[in-house]
């Protein structure tokens, strides 16, 4: 079994990255890969950009990582009562890959935490 985990945040000090890393560590004797969205920074999605430039290589590489997993652990950061622009952008790009489900039809364990009073509940 392989777990691929990531936080939907581009913050270097992301509490959601800490959370998803901690949760991944609770699965002993399982192959784990923790992704950092900063390693997959790409242009803001637009249909026009896709038409002229195609899907960015980094989006394809991120999708391959997702496809390699048996289980996805995702901890979503909350910005202004919604998920982050970084997560939305990568989600938009991978959703455009032909004949592919957004998260490859994988099982997803969704987490969130936030320091505010909502505690991340708007994104789960």
Where are these regions (language model features)?
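Short, glycine-/small-residue-rich phosphate/pyrophosphate-handling segment
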Residues: 104-124
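N-terminal beta1-alpha1-beta2 submodule of the flavodoxin-like/Rossmannoid cofactor-binding fold
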Residues: 1-99
């Amino acid at each position: 079994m392989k777990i691929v985990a990531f936080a939907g945040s581009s913050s270097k000090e992301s509490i959601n990255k800490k959370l998803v890393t901690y949760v991944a560590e609770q699965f002993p004797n399982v192959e784990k890969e923790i992704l950092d969205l900063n390693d997959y920074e790409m242009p803001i999605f637009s249909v026009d950009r896709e038409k002229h430039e195609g899907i960015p290589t980094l989006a394809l590489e991120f999708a391959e990582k997702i496809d390699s997993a048996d289980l996805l652990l995702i901890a979503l950061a909350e910005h202004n009562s919604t998920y982050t622009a970084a997560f939305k952008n990568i989600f938009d790009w991978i959703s455009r890959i032909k004949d592919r489900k957004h998260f490859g039809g994988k099982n997803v364990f969704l987490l969130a935490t936030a320091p505010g009073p909502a505690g991340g509940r708007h994104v789960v």
